[in-house]
A protein has these predicted regions:
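Acidic/polar active-site rim loop that often engages polyanionic ligands
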Residues: 1-10
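Alpha-helical segments flanking ligand/cofactor-binding loops in enzyme cores
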Residues: 73-77, 192
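Hydrophobic faces of well-ordered beta-strands that scaffold small-molecule active sites
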Residues: 62-66, 81-86, 111-118, 202-205
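Glycine-rich, proline-tolerant flexible connector loops at the mouths of alpha/beta enzymes
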Residues: 87-92, 204-217
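Structural motif
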Residues: 78-79, 197
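An alpha-helical appendage that flanks or caps ligand/catalytic pockets
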Residues: 9, 13-57, 87-196, 225-238
Length: 238
Protein backbone atom coordinates (compact mmCIF):
# COMPACT_ATOMS: atom_id res chain seq x y z
CA UNK A 1 0.00 0.00 0.00
CA UNK A 2 2.80 2.41 0.80
CA UNK A 3 4.42 1.66 -2.56
CA UNK A 4 1.14 2.53 -4.31
CA UNK A 5 1.44 6.08 -2.98
CA UNK A 6 5.24 6.23 -3.29
CA UNK A 7 5.65 6.54 0.47
CA UNK A 8 8.98 5.41 1.87
CA UNK A 9 8.94 4.45 5.53
CA UNK A 10 12.11 4.63 7.57
CA UNK A 11 13.49 1.56 9.30
CA UNK A 12 13.79 3.67 12.45
CA UNK A 13 11.02 3.31 15.02
CA UNK A 14 11.65 6.88 16.17
CA UNK A 15 11.23 8.30 12.68
CA UNK A 16 8.12 6.25 11.93
CA UNK A 17 6.41 7.36 15.11
CA UNK A 18 7.45 10.96 14.52
CA UNK A 19 5.84 10.68 11.07
CA UNK A 20 2.75 9.10 12.63
CA UNK A 21 2.49 11.85 15.24
CA UNK A 22 2.47 14.57 12.60
CA UNK A 23 -0.09 12.65 10.52
CA UNK A 24 -2.34 12.27 13.57
CA UNK A 25 -2.00 15.95 14.48
CA UNK A 26 -3.24 16.81 10.98
CA UNK A 27 -6.16 14.40 11.26
CA UNK A 28 -7.21 15.90 14.61
CA UNK A 29 -7.05 19.37 13.08
CA UNK A 30 -9.24 18.23 10.17
CA UNK A 31 -11.76 16.74 12.58
CA UNK A 32 -11.94 19.82 14.79
CA UNK A 33 -11.52 22.74 12.36
CA UNK A 34 -14.43 24.40 10.59
CA UNK A 35 -12.10 26.34 8.31
CA UNK A 36 -9.45 25.54 5.74
CA UNK A 37 -5.89 25.50 7.02
CA UNK A 38 -2.35 25.17 5.70
CA UNK A 39 0.24 22.85 7.19
CA UNK A 40 4.02 23.09 6.94
CA UNK A 41 5.63 20.33 8.93
CA UNK A 42 8.62 18.02 8.84
CA UNK A 43 6.84 15.38 6.77
CA UNK A 44 3.78 17.09 5.28
CA UNK A 45 3.23 20.31 3.37
CA UNK A 46 -0.48 20.89 2.78
CA UNK A 47 -2.63 23.73 1.48
CA UNK A 48 -6.31 24.53 1.93
CA UNK A 49 -7.01 21.44 4.01
CA UNK A 50 -10.63 20.88 5.03
CA UNK A 51 -12.62 17.80 5.91
CA UNK A 52 -16.35 17.20 5.89
CA UNK A 53 -18.39 15.52 7.27
CA UNK A 54 -16.90 15.61 10.75
CA UNK A 55 -16.94 12.65 13.13
CA UNK A 56 -20.39 11.80 14.44
CA UNK A 57 -21.40 13.90 17.42
CA UNK A 58 -18.81 16.58 16.72
CA UNK A 59 -16.15 14.93 18.86
CA UNK A 60 -12.93 13.09 18.12
CA UNK A 61 -13.81 9.36 18.11
CA UNK A 62 -12.15 7.00 20.59
CA UNK A 63 -8.64 6.18 19.42
CA UNK A 64 -7.17 2.69 19.85
CA UNK A 65 -3.52 2.00 19.11
CA UNK A 66 -1.47 -1.18 19.27
CA UNK A 67 2.10 -0.93 20.45
CA UNK A 68 4.60 -3.01 22.39
CA UNK A 69 7.81 -1.06 21.75
CA UNK A 70 8.78 1.86 23.98
CA UNK A 71 8.04 4.27 21.12
CA UNK A 72 4.69 2.65 20.42
CA UNK A 73 3.59 2.83 24.03
CA UNK A 74 4.70 6.46 24.28
CA UNK A 75 2.68 7.28 21.16
CA UNK A 76 -0.40 5.61 22.64
CA UNK A 77 0.09 7.27 26.03
CA UNK A 78 0.12 10.69 24.35
CA UNK A 79 -2.66 10.15 21.82
CA UNK A 80 -4.84 7.09 22.32
CA UNK A 81 -7.79 6.34 24.55
CA UNK A 82 -6.93 2.64 24.54
CA UNK A 83 -3.74 0.68 23.94
CA UNK A 84 -3.65 -2.87 22.63
CA UNK A 85 -0.90 -5.00 24.13
CA UNK A 86 -0.05 -8.71 24.02
CA UNK A 87 -0.77 -10.69 27.18
CA UNK A 88 1.75 -13.40 28.07
CA UNK A 89 0.48 -14.18 31.56
CA UNK A 90 -1.70 -12.30 34.01
CA UNK A 91 1.05 -11.47 36.48
CA UNK A 92 3.25 -9.73 33.93
CA UNK A 93 0.12 -8.37 32.23
CA UNK A 94 -0.98 -6.58 35.41
CA UNK A 95 2.46 -5.02 35.78
CA UNK A 96 2.39 -3.93 32.14
CA UNK A 97 -1.05 -2.32 32.53
CA UNK A 98 0.16 -0.41 35.58
CA UNK A 99 3.26 0.82 33.75
CA UNK A 100 1.23 1.94 30.72
CA UNK A 101 -1.23 3.86 32.89
CA UNK A 102 1.64 5.53 34.74
CA UNK A 103 3.19 6.48 31.42
CA UNK A 104 -0.06 8.16 30.36
CA UNK A 105 -0.25 10.04 33.66
CA UNK A 106 3.12 11.54 32.81
CA UNK A 107 1.39 13.23 29.88
CA UNK A 108 -1.57 14.29 32.02
CA UNK A 109 -3.84 11.69 30.44
CA UNK A 110 -5.72 8.51 31.28
CA UNK A 111 -5.65 5.44 29.07
CA UNK A 112 -7.35 2.06 29.03
CA UNK A 113 -5.54 -1.13 28.06
CA UNK A 114 -6.93 -3.91 25.88
CA UNK A 115 -5.48 -7.27 25.00
CA UNK A 116 -6.56 -9.86 22.48
CA UNK A 117 -7.55 -13.50 22.92
CA UNK A 118 -8.62 -16.55 20.98
CA UNK A 119 -11.66 -18.42 22.26
CA UNK A 120 -12.51 -22.10 22.24
CA UNK A 121 -15.76 -22.33 24.19
CA UNK A 122 -17.77 -25.55 24.48
CA UNK A 123 -20.45 -26.87 26.88
CA UNK A 124 -17.79 -28.73 28.87
CA UNK A 125 -14.14 -28.09 29.68
CA UNK A 126 -13.25 -31.50 28.25
CA UNK A 127 -14.88 -30.75 24.88
CA UNK A 128 -13.11 -27.40 24.62
CA UNK A 129 -9.69 -28.83 25.45
CA UNK A 130 -10.12 -31.77 23.07
CA UNK A 131 -11.02 -29.51 20.14
CA UNK A 132 -8.21 -27.12 21.04
CA UNK A 133 -5.71 -29.98 20.99
CA UNK A 134 -7.15 -31.30 17.73
CA UNK A 135 -6.77 -28.16 15.63
CA UNK A 136 -3.81 -26.51 17.40
CA UNK A 137 -1.66 -29.58 17.92
CA UNK A 138 -2.67 -32.70 16.01
CA UNK A 139 -3.66 -30.86 12.82
CA UNK A 140 -1.41 -27.81 13.14
CA UNK A 141 0.53 -26.72 10.06
CA UNK A 142 3.86 -26.36 11.84
CA UNK A 143 5.91 -25.18 8.84
CA UNK A 144 3.36 -22.41 8.30
CA UNK A 145 3.44 -21.55 12.02
CA UNK A 146 7.23 -21.31 11.99
CA UNK A 147 7.16 -19.17 8.86
CA UNK A 148 4.59 -16.81 10.39
CA UNK A 149 6.69 -16.40 13.52
CA UNK A 150 9.78 -15.82 11.41
CA UNK A 151 8.02 -13.06 9.47
CA UNK A 152 7.25 -11.35 12.77
CA UNK A 153 10.83 -11.59 13.98
CA UNK A 154 10.21 -14.36 16.51
CA UNK A 155 13.03 -16.90 16.45
CA UNK A 156 14.06 -19.77 18.72
CA UNK A 157 17.28 -17.91 19.56
CA UNK A 158 15.29 -14.89 20.78
CA UNK A 159 13.62 -16.68 23.72
CA UNK A 160 14.32 -19.27 26.39
CA UNK A 161 13.14 -22.69 25.14
CA UNK A 162 10.02 -22.70 27.36
CA UNK A 163 8.94 -19.24 26.18
CA UNK A 164 9.49 -20.12 22.53
CA UNK A 165 7.40 -23.28 22.89
CA UNK A 166 4.62 -21.25 24.52
CA UNK A 167 4.60 -18.72 21.68
CA UNK A 168 4.77 -21.42 19.03
CA UNK A 169 1.79 -23.25 20.48
CA UNK A 170 -0.19 -20.02 20.73
CA UNK A 171 0.59 -19.11 17.15
CA UNK A 172 -0.72 -22.49 16.04
CA UNK A 173 -3.87 -21.99 18.07
CA UNK A 174 -4.62 -18.29 17.62
CA UNK A 175 -1.90 -16.13 16.05
CA UNK A 176 0.06 -15.88 19.29
CA UNK A 177 -2.57 -14.28 21.52
CA UNK A 178 -3.87 -15.33 24.94
CA UNK A 179 -5.94 -18.55 25.10
CA UNK A 180 -9.46 -18.67 26.50
CA UNK A 181 -10.28 -22.37 26.37
CA UNK A 182 -13.08 -23.96 28.34
CA UNK A 183 -16.75 -23.98 29.22
CA UNK A 184 -18.67 -20.68 29.53
CA UNK A 185 -18.06 -20.36 33.28
CA UNK A 186 -14.33 -20.88 32.83
CA UNK A 187 -14.18 -18.29 30.05
CA UNK A 188 -15.95 -15.76 32.27
CA UNK A 189 -13.62 -16.55 35.17
CA UNK A 190 -10.62 -15.89 32.93
CA UNK A 191 -12.11 -12.61 31.68
CA UNK A 192 -12.74 -11.62 35.30
CA UNK A 193 -9.05 -12.14 35.93
CA UNK A 194 -8.34 -9.82 32.99
CA UNK A 195 -10.45 -7.16 34.67
CA UNK A 196 -8.77 -7.69 38.04
CA UNK A 197 -5.38 -7.30 36.33
CA UNK A 198 -6.48 -3.86 35.10
CA UNK A 199 -7.47 -4.58 31.52
CA UNK A 200 -10.38 -2.61 30.08
CA UNK A 201 -11.30 -5.42 27.71
CA UNK A 202 -10.16 -7.91 25.13
CA UNK A 203 -10.87 -8.66 21.52
CA UNK A 204 -11.86 -12.23 20.75
CA UNK A 205 -11.23 -14.49 17.77
CA UNK A 206 -12.59 -17.92 16.91
CA UNK A 207 -11.65 -20.75 14.58
CA UNK A 208 -15.04 -20.35 12.91
CA UNK A 209 -16.98 -17.21 13.77
CA UNK A 210 -20.21 -18.34 12.08
CA UNK A 211 -20.42 -21.58 14.03
CA UNK A 212 -18.85 -20.53 17.33
CA UNK A 213 -19.85 -16.94 18.03
CA UNK A 214 -23.60 -17.62 18.56
CA UNK A 215 -22.76 -19.98 21.45
CA UNK A 216 -20.35 -17.41 22.91
CA UNK A 217 -23.00 -14.71 22.52
CA UNK A 218 -25.73 -16.75 24.17
CA UNK A 219 -23.72 -18.33 26.99
CA UNK A 220 -20.77 -16.06 27.80
CA UNK A 221 -22.06 -12.52 27.27
CA UNK A 222 -25.04 -12.87 29.66
CA UNK A 223 -22.68 -14.20 32.34
CA UNK A 224 -20.38 -11.20 31.84
CA UNK A 225 -23.37 -8.87 32.14
CA UNK A 226 -24.51 -10.62 35.33
CA UNK A 227 -21.05 -10.05 36.85
CA UNK A 228 -21.10 -6.38 35.87
CA UNK A 229 -18.18 -6.79 33.45
CA UNK A 230 -20.19 -5.85 30.39
CA UNK A 231 -23.06 -3.47 29.70
CA UNK A 232 -26.14 -5.01 28.17
CA UNK A 233 -26.39 -4.31 24.47
CA UNK A 234 -29.59 -2.51 23.52
CA UNK A 235 -30.44 -2.51 19.84
CA UNK A 236 -31.39 1.02 18.75
CA UNK A 237 -34.91 1.67 17.58
CA UNK A 238 -35.25 1.49 13.83
Amino acid sequence: EYDMFKIELSDSHDVRYSYGQEWYDIIKRIWSSNHEFDWDGKYFSLRHVYGNPKPFGGEIPPIMNAGSSDQGQNFAAQNADYLFTVLIDLESGAANVKAIKERAKGYGREIGVFTTSYVVCRPSQKEAEEYHNYYANEEADWPAVDRLMELQGLHAKSFPPEAFTLFRNRFAAGHGVYPLVGDPDHIVDEMTRFYEAGFSGTTVTFVNYTDEFPYFRDEVLPRLEAKGLRSQYCQPDK
